[in-house]
Amino acid sequence: LTSGHNVQSTVFIEVSAEYRPDGPEEMRPVGEVEFVENLVSNRGGSSPKTAAAIIGKADLKLGNNVRPVLEALAAASPDRFRGIRHSVGWDASPDILNREIQGALSTESYRDGARQLADMGFILENSLYFPQLEELADFAKAIPDLTIVVNHIGGLLRIGPYANRDEEVFGEWRKGIALLSQCSNVVMKLGGVGQARYGFDWSRRSKPVGSEELAGSLKPLMEHCIDQFGVDRCMFESNFPVDKVSYSYNVVYNAFKRLSMGYSSTERSSLFHDNAVRVYSIGG
């Protein structure tokens, strides 16, 4: 974080860790927010501001009954808690890790839970796979007052049944991104492509990928997102430490800088800083 990229703040996104060991099952994820809040509070004033915003986890399938969980999460971090991530990635292939039941976004219970989230002024981080983008668009239209932050350029897949089919896969992904971009309450995060399911070989190389090559690989993907959503609804994400299996923090941020060189200083400020400050309500 202090390696020359002028990182001013970070956002903590849940990783299903440090849960409460007992108590009601639905309340156990509160332990993760309690852990992070305690960690950050004990550090005192620091620069950059670590975990200036915290995204926890709650099961939206609880429907209206998720509200006490959200209240507990907010109480655990009154100044930093901003919302939750409920990953809904599902695919019929056994090669793809399923994180939710099929069609979770379309269930009334999940939507009722999401309405509780919106009513309390919190945001929803959403991680899914690209064949679900149309379902997410329908969900976003049904709850227009909920800000939805889509993770990792919309869940591109290039493994299992999606391997060696780039023309078809990229075509369907582009269509899904274009459809989702019509929902004004949706924001896109640009990153997370170092994970194995994105089908690149960077993690298997004997020599690490450099920022110039990485920028070349990322540019067409991220430019499509920016073209569809606009500069004001996109933001770069490191997805660290998860993505460090494929490249270093320095390399990925240098790649972001390279691929964004054609944008104005104001546009780059939006992509690297301003949009995140707005979406996550990060103070000065």
Residue spans for each PLM region:
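Conserved, mostly hydrophobic/aromatic
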Residues: T10, V36, I54, I84, ...
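Alpha-helical elements of Rossmann-like donor-binding domains used by nucleotide-donor carbohydrate transfer enzymes
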Residues: F35, P68, A72, E135, ...
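Short histidine/acidic/glycine/proline-rich micro-motifs that form metal-
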Residues: S16-D22, I55-K61, Q195, F240-D243
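Mid-to-C-terminal alpha-helical segments outside catalytic/metal-binding sites
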Residues: L1-S9, E223-H224, Q228-M235, V242-G284
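Conserved residues at the C-terminal ends of beta-strands
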Residues: I13, K57, S87, G191, ...
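Catalytic pocket-lining loop regions of alpha/beta-barrel enzymes
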Residues: E100-M235, S246, S264
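Active-site gating/metal-coordination segments in enzymes
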Residues: G23-Q132, D138-K141, G154, A163-V169, ...
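Active-site gating loops and adjacent loop-to-helix segments of metal-dependent hydrolytic enzymes
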Residues: L1-P21, E26, A76-I101, L146-T147, ...
